[in-house]
Amino acid sequence: MAAVETRVCETDGCSSEAKLQCPTCIKLGIQGSYFCSQECFKGSWATHKLLHKKAKDEKAKREVSSWTVEGDINTDPWAGYRYTGKLRPHYPLMPTRPVPSYIQRPDYADHPLGMSESEQALKGTSQIKLLSSEDIEGMRLVCRLAREVLDIAAGMIKPGVTTEEIDHAVHLACIARNCYPSPLNYYNFPKSCCTSVNEVICHGIPDRRPLQEGDIVNVDITLYRNGYHGDLNETFFVGEVDDGARKLVQTTYECLMQAIDAVKPGVRYRELGNIIQKHAQANGFSVVRSYCGHGIHKLFHTAPNVPHYAKNKAVGVMKSGHVFTIEPMICEGGWQDETWPDGWTAVTRDGKRSAQFEHTLLVTDTGCEILTRRLDSARPHFMSQF
């Protein structure tokens, strides 16, 4: 760390003189960030590093090359970045949509860095919350509403529709149900849902690219209502797709459902990855390792951690009253991923397609309840597109 003029340490609760500044902040041009010692710096790292991410994201947005299509849409906003596949972002993004003040908001909604302090307080713990009957009813409600919103998005999937238009509809549908769209400002995510097209594994940011015939697109919805989050996603076909896309999406859904069939008290969370990877590999596909299922209730992401790959080291045994997601991401090629310069969009390193399905589950005495199931059909939407 570089020596600087004397300042007051920025660690919460410390008023010592600070003579050291974070070297990364100096490099990124972030003002302030003074600490009295390496110990204070390390103790503040979990929160402090978010400043780096935000600064990098803002820098990436400024590094705009020449316009490459007609009008005001830029399909190459990050000069020099080598894309892994054919998909390109369509910038600039539309402005972040407001949420009315009467809608109850999670703790990160108005945080300048989008940080959830309630999640940070429990970071690193492996203790899994047992939900009360009141908690369970809260989860049933928000998951049912999240399903309604995903079904609205499903009805919009066709060539020519932009993911920005889907996000707009999702945002309005959340507000109409007195819900906050959980992704919005979660660690500064700029939209109300995630839309992941073709080689995008997850966390795709809705933009003005029209969906094209032959695409596959995942829409990931999470709602917040009365203090609880409900989370689900599905992958859809855009018009007519090739046989490879059909097999990938079908297999991904089967991976999810086979894992769900194993959920009951006494099962180790690590076992789910063995089930998922066995089925994926039997069909010639790979399983993403960087992103996992998670506990969910009053916190968006919490224990347990639920990896989808085999021989993982996940901690915990299922008990009645646990609520968590399973959301396998299955790839045509290799499982390795990288992230676009926007800091969010995860893509396959080889540029091949990836699909995903997700449900929020409640462990019961004899098995599990799929809280985000369709109420009008036992089939996912893509099966109606065959």
Curated annotation (Swiss-Prot):
One of its GO terms (cellular component) is cytosolic ribosome. Binds 2 divalent metal cations per subunit. Has a high-affinity and a low affinity metal-binding site. The true nature of the physiological cofactor is under debate. The enzyme is active with zinc, cobalt, manganese or divalent iron ions. Has high activity with zinc; zinc cofactor is transferred into the active site region by the ZNG1 zinc chaperone. Its EC number is 3.4.11.18. A zinc finger (C6H2-type) spans 6-59. Its main location: cytoplasm. Its cofactor is Zn(2+); Co(2+); Mn(2+); Fe(2+). SUPFAM superfamilies: Creatinase/aminopeptidase. The keyword Metal-binding applies. It catalyses: Release of N-terminal amino acids, preferentially methionine, from peptides and arylamides. It holds the Pfam family zf-C6H2. Gene3D superfamilies: Creatinase/methionine aminopeptidase superfamily. Zn(2+) 4 binds at residues 231, 294, 327, 358. One of its GO terms (molecular function) is initiator methionyl aminopeptidase activity. Keywords: Acetylation, Aminopeptidase, Cytoplasm, Hydrolase, Metal-binding, Protease, Zinc, Zinc-finger. It is an enzyme of class 3 (hydrolase). Associates with the 60S ribosomal subunit of the 80S translational complex. Belongs to the peptidase M24A family. Methionine aminopeptidase type 1 subfamily. This is Methionine aminopeptidase 1. It comes from Pongo abelii. The gene is METAP1.
